[in-house]
UniProtKB/Swiss-Prot annotation:
Disulfide bonds: none annotated. This is ATP-dependent Clp protease proteolytic subunit. It is found in: Cytoplasm. One of its GO terms (molecular function) is ATP-dependent peptidase activity. Its EC number is 3.4.21.92. It comes from Shewanella sp. (strain W3-18-1). It comes from the Bacteria. Fourteen ClpP subunits assemble into 2 heptameric rings which stack back to back to give a disk-like structure with a central cavity, resembling the structure of eukaryotic proteasomes.
Amino acid sequence: MHNASDIQNALVPMVIEQTAKGERSYDIYSRLLKERIIFLVGQVEEHMANLIVAQLLFLESESPDKDIFLYINSPGGSVTAGMAIYDTMQFIKPNVSTVCIGQAASMGAFLLAGGEKGKRFCLPNSRVMIHQPLGGFQGQASDIAIHAQEILGIKHKLNLMLAEHTGQPLEVIERDTDRDNFMSATQAVEYGLVDSVMTKRG
């Protein structure tokens, strides 16, 4: 019986290249990594975050002066996993250009906005959604209170960072993230989450 990751891996296309030493095959994502393109697809979680961080660090070591392109199609996910990616994006020397394909929701939207100013893009039919961090902790009342305090602290910190990346006042961010807030690509530009809608490769 095959698990979901086996099936997914079987569906990843392979690219065959001719080299001086003969043929070499890559999975499509490894081949795109050679072009400094990283895909952030699906739920943001610890394993995925570690892979993204490793790719960012590898590309920095390869060429610290060349831009990295992070393509995002994600419904969001773990704040801590997302912050590991975000902090690495800010830490490394290359500019990280972010591109939303499909959707960038929740932590996906935060990472989209965290790209290099002037190099954050949406494709025309993509959607962006921002909201406050989700809770859901269960346990003793005292532990629930501790986690509630932690979530409020994270919420305030994320709002401050979104305000910095978008240019929106903090009170506007607080109001607009109180509930799920969906935006078209054009609205995301107007809001400051991205810099422009990309219809054709320049």
